[in-house]
Swiss-Prot record:
Cofactor details (free text): Binds 1 Mg(2+) ion per subunit.
Listed Gene3D superfamilies: Aldolase class I
One GO MF term: magnesium ion binding
SUPFAM superfamilies named among the record's database cross-references: Thiamin phosphate synthase (SSF51391)
Superkingdom to which the source organism belongs: Bacteria
Protein name: Thiamine-phosphate synthase
Organism of provenance: Listeria monocytogenes serovar 1/2a (strain ATCC BAA-679 / EGD-e)
Length: 214
């Protein structure tokens, strides 16, 4: 799971500024992302279940073509219906124990955490495959984001002896990803770093190898 978290792209229709979600996703897949989470939320997102399912299936097909895990944010029923590779939920989405009961053994389970105690609980549960920790830096992509934690939260989690795979989240781009990895994350998740880039292949290369020339 750790390798799959290296460059974890998150996006929904609401995040796309040029082109379409499938076209942006395919460019990112060609560029080398290692995981994709379909997150359809907020202003500008698809509003009907049928639209979201149709888009999810299109994105899932692209991920399968490039052999990259396809994860759905929050919507357990949709993830189960279409056979997603994973489900990611937050602390205020469906209760994690309910998600585990429905999904464990069928797909990977990711959980957002914002403190050492939440990280400890995620590891204690045993069925959570990875945690998303953040927001590390200020973010424009999530209107309901928690307060910024900085990279210190990653160091605190690792110092506490927590070994569960971690992907850093929130305001991460090619200029600050090295800090996130050095602090203890196994990978970085990005939205605008890819969706707003004129050259996502270069961005992804730098996210995978911080300090490398673009």
């Amino acid at each position: 799971m750790r390798a799959e978290l290296a460059v974890y792209f998150i996006a929904g229709t609401q995040d796309i500024v040029r082109g379409t979600l499938p076209s942006v996703l395919e460019e990112a897949l060609k560029g080398g992302i290692t995981c994709f989470q379909y997150r359809e939320k907020g202003a500008g997102s698809l509003q009907t279940a049928s639209e979201r399912k149709e888009m999810a299936l299109e994105c899932q097909k692209l991920c399968a073509k490039y052999q990259v895990p396809f994860i759905i944010n929050d919507d357990v029923a949709l993830a189960l219906e279409i056979g997603a590779d994973g489900i990611h939920v937050g602390q205020t989405d469906e209760a994690i124990r309910q998600v585990i009961a429905s999904c464990s053994g069928k797909m990977k389970i990711g959980l957002s955490v914002h403190s050492v105690s939440e990280a400890k609980e995620a590891e204690r549960l045993g069925a959570v495959d990875y945690i998303g920790v953040g927001p590390i830096f200020p973010t424009i992509s999530k209107a309901d984001a928690e307060p910024v934690s900085g990279t210190a939260i990653l160091e605190e989690i690792r110092r506490a002896g927590i070994t569960i795979p971690i992907v850093g989240i929130g305001g991460i781009n090619e200029t600050n990803s090295a800090e996130v990895l050095t602090a203890g994350a196994d990978g970085v998740s990005v939205i605008s770093a890819i969706t707003q880039s004129d050259d996502c292949h270069s961005v992804i290369k730098q996210l995978k190898n911080p300090g490398s020339p673009s």
